[in-house]
Amino acid sequence: MVRKHGWQLPAHKFQVVAITVFCLLSVAYYAFFAPFVGGRIWEYILLGVYSPVALIVFVLYVRCTAINPADPGIMSKFERGASRGGDLPTAKDISRKFDETGSHLQSSPSVASRTSTLPNSSVKGSVGDAQRVEAAKRKSCFNPLAICCGVFVYEDCRSKEETDEQQGDREEALFCTLCNAEVRKFSKHCRSCDKCVDCFDHHCRWLNNCVGRKNYMTFISLMAVSLLWLLIEAGVGIAVIVRVFVNKKDMETEIVNRLGNGFSRAPFATVVGLCTAVSMLALFPLGELFFFHMLLIKKGITTYEYVVAMRAMSEAPAGASIDEEIPNVLYSPSGSATTGFSGGSSLGLPYKGAWCTPPRVFVDYQDEVIPHLDPRMVPSTVDPDAAETAERGNKIPKRPVKISAWKLAKLNSNEATRAAARARASSSVLRPIENRHLHDDELSSRSGTISVVSSVSTEANGATLSREIRNNDPMLSHCRNSYAPSQGSRDEYDTGTHSMSSLSSPSHVHETVTLSPLPQHHTAGHRFTAAAASNSSRPPLNQATNHMIHSTFDEKIMQKGNHADPLLLPAPAASLLRDVRRTSVVWDQEAGRYISVPATTSEPRTRFSSQNQPIPSSHMGNTQNPRPVGHPPQDSSSGRAPPPTQQQQGERLMYTGESIFFGGPLVNIPNRDGLRHDGDSGREGQDRMTLTLPREARFKRDTTSNQLPVFAPVGTRK
């Protein structure tokens, strides 16, 4: 159950003890301490000093316990609970809507055309929710009772520097898998409160609440005032005990006059002595804790960072520093060693994991390191699951770290900060979220991109076209069948949608094909451009034109398996040109699969700057149209070259063997399309034949190792 504050039931036993002791000591002071100091004047002075101090302790304790230190990313959960199921969505609902939106965009391009008018709908929704929460807060401020309660529950004020630092932390936000929400960089999930705490310091059992950014200053003030309160209590108690044993007759008379005949000198001395002893016993640990936090503030670290650093020092080998990096061993994706060990942490921290087949599903356990495995390779005969079960059965619980101001004084704050950073990096609860903002931007661009595809499908038998896109697109079908929309399919889905983005404007299709660093195998660009351009000036398209658009669009979809993602370049409003980056295929250990990374952008930008220059003959084969429809004729002096031969196609291909990346090169495939005439029976027949080949024919495994072929990036081949 998610706890909102420390007053929420069930109460911790330490919290009950703290409240009980405060009440007993306060009553004892007014009944047994102040009246017996000696004289009315001293009594009034001590009551005047003690009363405001005790009141401040009470207010600060109530305030520090009542403040909700949760991260702002999960505050919507509490706001919705307060409104009794109102219309404020939780972070989980927003995340679910985000995933459902991505799945709808992936499966139905026509849906995206309706949402293209609001490309940042998910972002606007979250902003709208935050505005509704702020509006509810503003309305509650006009309630007089809310103003009185605000003294106890309103969070601590922060300086401008801390606010700027807080804004900077949003750039490196994390995603909590337990809260299912985006949290700030220095937040941590408290398992006692079951929520992420903003700038987590520690969970105080005496308050039954977490101490974080929102109530840390109140916590420090509470300790300081409590020390003063205990000092007054203990000092006055010692003075009264001295009078009991020094002025016995006078004290007996005062006890009878003020408390009645039921109290004698012995019981009175016992009560005063116990209360004084309790005050002194509480004074020393509280003073050490206050001094400890003063050192933390001076060093600029938190209690959590201190605990992590001390635990790392206790578990580190003798003579090793806590900031030493364990060597990060690189593993082959096809090697057997990946079944036992992984260096999946972003900072090179090894943590326990178990690879599944295929190596995309990875299960890790927070703050655990494999004790039975060395950083070297292990044989494939080792069963990590069996070893893990045996280890969990004999697992020794972590020893609690004692709060020591002396150890903190000798601790290097930089080492503590690095140790805490490693702990966050190796956590299975908090994950980095850098790519999440990028995914939101990409999703916005995809909405506008797919809407064009939807409009084309409406004009040219949209039902058939959308069905062909889903059937002939191996990338989208693979993502839809293998990954969840929120994790594994982002890179692949990005490739598919950006390939369709070249159809966003008919006048840009020709430019995109010309600027592509990879060769084009057909002349779909001109025919699609001409068909789209002539649509506004002619009657509706006939059946032959529909068939031509379907075939050319299928060929465009087939090309995206061999093309990189398009890069949008700054351009004037009249003409938006799209550039293409060359990519390299590398193995991502954290994702457990191959990903495409940009190699360079200089070549596409160079081609973009020289697009008005004469096009070489090697590229004319990609842009010439043997059958232009509605396109103005070109001069014979423009250097029209015949289509390249089969040998020239093979020389320009990225890879020469069969590839696992969606069909591989289109070479040595027999021409079986006899229904088309001679003008289109060259490369178009080969492209059409590739689309009709089964998946097993395009993705062939090696007969000896039963593995799919692996290829190195182009930059490494000579």
UniProtKB/Swiss-Prot annotation:
Per its record, how is this protein called by name? Probable protein S-acyltransferase 19
Swiss-Prot/TrEMBL keywords: Acyltransferase, Cell membrane, Lipoprotein, Membrane, Palmitate, Transferase, Transmembrane, Transmembrane helix
Q: Report the InterPro entries cross-referenced here.
A: Palmitoyltrfase_DHHC, PFA4/ZDH16/20/ERF2-like
Physiological role: Palmitoyl acyltransferase.
Entry's free-text remark on domains: The DHHC domain is required for palmitoyltransferase activity.
List, alphabetically, the GO terms of the cellular component aspect: plasma membrane
* GO molecular function term, any single one: protein-cysteine S-palmitoyltransferase activity
Query: By its UniProt entry, which PROSITE patterns does this protein fall under?
Result: DHHC
Where in the sequence is the active site? 204 (s-palmitoyl cysteine intermediate)
Q: What is the catalytic activity of this protein?
A: L-cysteinyl-[protein] + hexadecanoyl-CoA = S-hexadecanoyl-L-cysteinyl-[protein] + CoA
Residue ranges for the region (Disordered) are 100-125, 454-511, 598-649, 664-718
Matching Pfam families, A to Z?
A: DHHC
Q: Which residues form the DHHC domain?
A: 174-224
Report biased composition (Polar residues) as residue ranges.
103-124, 479-488, 598-626
Q: Which residues cross the membrane?
A: 16-36, 41-61, 222-242, 277-297
Q: Show the ranges annotated as biased composition (Basic and acidic residues).
A: 673-687
E.C. number: 2.3.1.225
User: Which locations, inside or outside the cell, does it occupy?
Assistant: Cell membrane
Q: Which family does it belong to?
A: Belongs to the DHHC palmitoyltransferase family.
Q: Which domain of life is it from?
A: Eukaryota
The protein's topology relative to the membrane is: Multi-pass membrane protein
Signal sequence extent: none
